[in-house]
Amino acid sequence: MPKTPIPLPQVRTVGLMQPMTWLVLAWRDMARSGWISFAHGLAITAFGGAILAVAHHRFWLLAGALSGFLVVAPVLATSLYALSRALEQRQEANLGVVLKTWLNWQNSHLNKWGNDYWCMVQFGALLALAATGWVITSAAFITLLAPVPVKTPMDFMRHVVLANNGWLFELWLGLGSLLAAPIFASSVIAMPLLLDRRASLRVAVLTSWQVVVANPLPMAFWAALILGFTLLGLGSLLLGLIFVMPMLGHASWHAYRDLVDASSLPLRDAAVATGQRSGVSS
């Protein structure tokens, strides 16, 4: 017997420049959330600084570690999605929302490993595994193919990026893009969907792919914006990430809301349902 297709939420199409609207809405959310949004950026920047401190004399490892760190960014931004959702529902976006996102729903379902309550944890573990794989691959690639040991950022610039002979940097970028593209397609709206709705990991990932297939140019533009702003954040000695990461996190929530009609799926908890009804009626 043929398998029954998995029912997925309806996917919408958007215009090419719609990602710019998501960024504008993200700045509005950052202004309304105040310090709690920027605290996320500060925490992510501090974590990036820790990576830098540990691996600064091993740039062959650092290049992969920093880029791999960005692979798990959709998980780290989970509570930013929750803050934007609270603001959308005309609720307070405060520390309580953040703590509830990271602690309460997991703690109340500790005995339900394997079902949809743990999808966010499982997806985070998969992204972390992908990031680790990229770190190892990148380190091996640079170590084996670089003409001299790459220990500092200047070594990386001189012997990889600006090398006169060979295509090492282009190959490194191509390999990274080849690995990053399916991760982006799998995660572009998956985490906000898992936060908002009671969906399986398979449904979230397939819906994310469906979004990319239905909106190839807007999603390519969105990916380019994410990459560009992230490079600006990294290029400012990580300080720019204090602003960039909250902005991209809030914007990702608005991307999800624009791109997916998830009304066919049940809300993740009753508390959210109550909040949505009160938000709409007020």
Regions found by a protein language model. Give the residues of each.
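Hydrophobic alpha-helical membrane segments
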Residues: 1-282
